């Protein structure tokens, strides 16, 4: 093939055989046996091939569903501990997508039901991270909704159908992809019924939202405005079937352990009754493992809503050892992230083991779980990250326990010189 530019080697005007543009309208015209193709058509062909290859890869990965053990193994790379929750989630997600792969097969008279998931665990125990990692692993659209912003239709606040709209936005309004996605609804415990007794006042952000979510979670056809527009009667709506969308609801459920303990420690009355001490109470995580649907109803979820979430997974409180592991072991561990930031400035960052212990202790004191680790490290490293880009001679930064406690500054090691550490400023 030859490259023809501007017709200099021939007086005849040449045209692209595909788009019909002349050689003067394009940058380059490539000649073949009695045919010509321009650079624009070559780019277009490359785009088409690239899209088809990506779609084929996505389809092949969708058909190859990892086993529960493989799913749990991948979760291990990102989430520390919570083995029981990982096992429950792995089996539930595997069965859900296995059900979707089988739904189009003819002659199968057994219809498999959907098993939505309820995650119960303290703040910062890894509920959201588990859901995010699952969606990334399965290559499906994923969105997070905050239950506290939802209200019944017709009231100020977000409509429950906005959840599906967010899911559509994640996959460029591809309805087929959205119908295979995962929705994580956070803070689900905050929409619990305000009182056990029916009230004259309408509870539009509590029981009202639970009622509105019922059909969405179980399976309905939701009408969603295209491209995020507002609803009006003359508008065309996108119809999204939610039967095959996996809903994962998560919440801290503060106080649920007391409901469980009251149920499990009820004794008889009289001289023969067993006397039980209040001090014999279990840890929150241990109590939550014994949760039953009735406990959730007493907490404030309506029975119908609890019934739509048949898979229960409880997460344990993170102890000091687990928090130290979270700081160093996962693929995207915080210490690795900050080390990478310093590496971009050609500086090594070292955390001593006593520093990691001090960070874990502080996070436990704040009762924020793993979520509090980043804010602690950010505060400790703020001044250093401010100064380092201006000090090209620094080669290493060392963080020990005293730095975390605020009694000294990080140790700075300079090239071809002695290490220096400034005293911590007086409070």
UniProtKB/Swiss-Prot annotation:
Annotated positions binding Zn(2+): 16, 19, 38, 41
Domain ClpX-type ZB: 4-57
Keywords, comma-separated and alphabetical: ATP-binding, Chaperone, Metal-binding, Nucleotide-binding, Zinc
Coiled coil: none
Keyword ATP-binding: yes
Any one GO MF annotation of this record: ATP-dependent protein folding chaperone
Annotated Gene Ontology cellular component terms: HslUV protease complex
Record CDD domains: RecA-like_ClpX (cd19497)
Residue sites binding ATP per the record: 122-129
InterPro entries named among the record's database cross-references: AAA+_ATPase (IPR003593), ATP-dep_Clp_protease_ClpX (IPR050052), ATPase_AAA_core (IPR003959), Clp_ATPase_C (IPR019489), Clp_protease_ATP-bd_su_ClpX (IPR004487), ClpX_bact (IPR046425), P-loop_NTPase (IPR027417), Znf_CppX_C4 (IPR010603)
Claim: Metal-binding is one of the keywords in the record: yes
GO BP: cell division; proteolysis involved in protein catabolic process
PANTHER family: ATP-DEPENDENT CLP PROTEASE ATP-BINDING SUBUNIT CLPX-LIKE, MITOCHONDRIAL (PTHR48102:SF7), ATP-DEPENDENT CLP PROTEASE ATP-BINDING SUBUNIT CLPX-LIKE, MITOCHONDRIAL-RELATED (PTHR48102)
UniProt family annotation: Belongs to the ClpX chaperone family.
Function of the molecule: ATP-dependent specificity component of the Clp protease. It directs the protease to specific substrates. Can perform chaperone functions in the absence of ClpP.
Oligomeric form and interacting partners: Component of the ClpX-ClpP complex. Forms a hexameric ring that, in the presence of ATP, binds to fourteen ClpP subunits assembled into a disk-like structure with a central cavity, resembling the structure of eukaryotic proteasomes.
Name of the protein: ATP-dependent Clp protease ATP-binding subunit ClpX
Organism: Pseudomonas putida (strain W619)
């Amino acid at each position: 093939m030859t490259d023809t530019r501007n017709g200099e080697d021939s007086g005849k005007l040449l045209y692209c055989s595909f788009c019909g543009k002349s050689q003067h309208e394009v940058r380059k015209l490539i000649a073949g046996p009695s045919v010509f193709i321009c650079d624009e058509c070559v780019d277009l062909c490359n785009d088409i091939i690239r899209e088809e290859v990506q779609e084929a890869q996505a389809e092949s990965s969708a058909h190859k569903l990892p086993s529960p053990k493989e799913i749990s193994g991948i979760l291990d790379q990102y989430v520390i501990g919570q083995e029981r929750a990982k096992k429950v989630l792995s089996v539930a997600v595997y069965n859900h997508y296995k059900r979707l792969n089988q739904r189009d097969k003819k002659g199968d008279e057994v219809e498999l039901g959907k098993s939505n998931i309820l995650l119960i665990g303290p703040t910062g125990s890894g509920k959201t991270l588990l859901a995010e990692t699952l969606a990334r692993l399965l290559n499906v659209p994923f969105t997070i909704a905050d239950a506290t912003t939802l209200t019944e239709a017709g009231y100020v606040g977000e409509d429950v159908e906005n959840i599906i709209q967010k899911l559509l936005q994640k996959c460029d309004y591809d309805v087929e992809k959205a119908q295979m996605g995962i929705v994580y609804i956070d803070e689900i415990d905050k929409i619990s019924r305000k009182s056990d007794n029916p009230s004259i006042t309408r509870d539009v952000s509590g029981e009202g939202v639970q009622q509105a979510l019922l059909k969405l979670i179980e399976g309905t056809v939701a009408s969603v405005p295209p491209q995020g527009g507002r609803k009006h009667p003359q508008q065309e709506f996108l119809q999204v079937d939610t039967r095959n969308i996996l809903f994962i609801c998560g919440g801290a459920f503060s106080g649920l352990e007391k409901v469980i303990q009251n149920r499990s420690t009820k004794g008889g009355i009289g001289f023969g009754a067993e006397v039980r001490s209040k001090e014999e109470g279990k840890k929150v995580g241990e109590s939550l493992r014994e949760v039953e649907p009735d406990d959730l109803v007493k907490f404030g979820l309506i029975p119908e809503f609890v019934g739509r979430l048949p898979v229960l997974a409880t997460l344990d409180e993170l102890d000091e050892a687990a928090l130290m592991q979270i700081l160093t072991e996962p693929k995207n561990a915080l210490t690795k992230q900050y080390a990478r930031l310093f590496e971009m400035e050609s500086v090594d960052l070292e955390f001593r083991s006593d520093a990691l212990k001090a960070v874990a202790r502080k996070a436990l004191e704040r009762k924020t779980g793993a979520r509090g680790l980043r804010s602690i490290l950010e505060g400790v490293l703020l001044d250093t990250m401010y100064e380092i880009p201006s000090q090209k001679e620094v080669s290493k930064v060392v963080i020990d326990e005293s730095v975390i406690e605020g009694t000294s500054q990080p140790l700075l090691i300079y090239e071809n010189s002695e290490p220096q550490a400034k005293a911590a400023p007086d409070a």
